UniProtKB/Swiss-Prot annotation:
The keyword S-adenosyl-L-methionine does not apply. NDH shuttles electrons from NAD(P)H:plastoquinone, via FMN and iron-sulfur (Fe-S) centers, to quinones in the photosynthetic chain and possibly in a chloroplast respiratory chain. The immediate electron acceptor for the enzyme in this species is believed to be plastoquinone. Couples the redox reaction to proton translocation, and thus conserves the redox energy in a proton gradient. Part of the chloroplast NDH complex, composed of a mixture of chloroplast and nucleus encoded subunits. Component of the electron donor-binding subcomplex, at least composed of NDHS, NDHT and NDHU. Its EC number is 7.1.1.-. Residues 1-53 form a transit peptide. It is found in: Plastid, Chloroplast thylakoid membrane. It is a single-pass membrane protein. Keywords: Chloroplast, Membrane, NAD, NADP, Plastid, Plastoquinone, Quinone, Thylakoid, Transit peptide, Translocase, Transmembrane, Transmembrane helix, Transport. One of its GO terms (molecular function) is quinone binding. This is NAD(P)H-quinone oxidoreductase subunit U, chloroplastic. Residues 95-159 form the J domain.
């Protein structure tokens, strides 16, 4: 009875990974075993330093390649630019022909020639690297627009509409038609034999008709 009158006190049981207060009566008639929560930790196989460095170099190389990728020039073909051209408003204030030093109705070959000449002039000016890159980007932008059929058509159409807003111009009216560089196929000589025979036959019938008409009138 003395054991029953004893006041039970909570005891602190230490469990690996956790600390939990368990109320363990001191008058238990059976042996008490603390429960231990076990946790499984899955460890990935160790990799050597060469694999880690190779992976780091791959990631670094891909990011560098993305950063160094050339930026494409913005396209002039958009719904907003089409709407502005229809209203007779300019879609850009850049004179792409003036940048390359060429005329509006020049051929595509002349666009390439003008681009190469402008690049040569810029390199001979002795500009620093940053200024040269800035001007080269502008030259490349103009060359890309004027050397692409769809982009140049949109640009020329906008120029034609903004110059004469009261007169509507179709986009294909401003296309630069490239002259054919192929020689035309040789023409076959026309066979005039059947035509000549037909003419002789009709002439003979006319002569015969006149002769018969004169004979019957006598």
């Amino acid at each position: 009875m003395a054991s029953l009158s004893t006041i039970t006190q909570p005891s602190l049981v230490h469990i690996p990974g956790e600390s939990v207060l368990h109320h363990v009566p001191s008058t238990c008639s059976f042996p008490w075993k603390p429960t231990i929560n076990t946790k499984r930790i899955i460890c990935s196989p160790a990799r050597n330093s060469s694999e880690v460095s190779a992976e780091a170099e791959t990631e670094g190389g891909s990011s560098t390649a993305v950063d160094e990728a050339p930026k494409e020039s913005p396209s002039l073909i958009s719904a907003l630019n089409v709407e502005r051209a229809l209203r007779g408003l300019p879609i850009t204030d850049v004179d792409h022909y003036g940048r390359l030093g060429i005329f509006r109705n020049c051929s595509y070959d002349q666009v390439t020639i003008g681009y190469k000449e402008r690049v040569k002039e810029l390199k001979e000016q002795g500009l620093d690297e940053e200024q040269l890159k800035t001007k080269m980007d502008l030259i490349k932008e103009s060359y890309t627009i004027l050397s692409t059929v769809e982009e140049r058509r949109m640009y020329d159409w906008s120029l034609a509409r903004s110059e004469k807003a009261e007169r509507y111009v179709w986009p294909f009216e401003v296309d630069i038609m490239e002259p054919s560089r192929e020689e035309p196929p040789p023409q076959e000589p026309e066979d005039v034999g059947p035509t000549r025979i037909l003419g002789y036959f009709i002439g003979a019938w006319l002569v015969l008709g006149v002769a018969l008409s004169v004979a019957f009138n006598r």
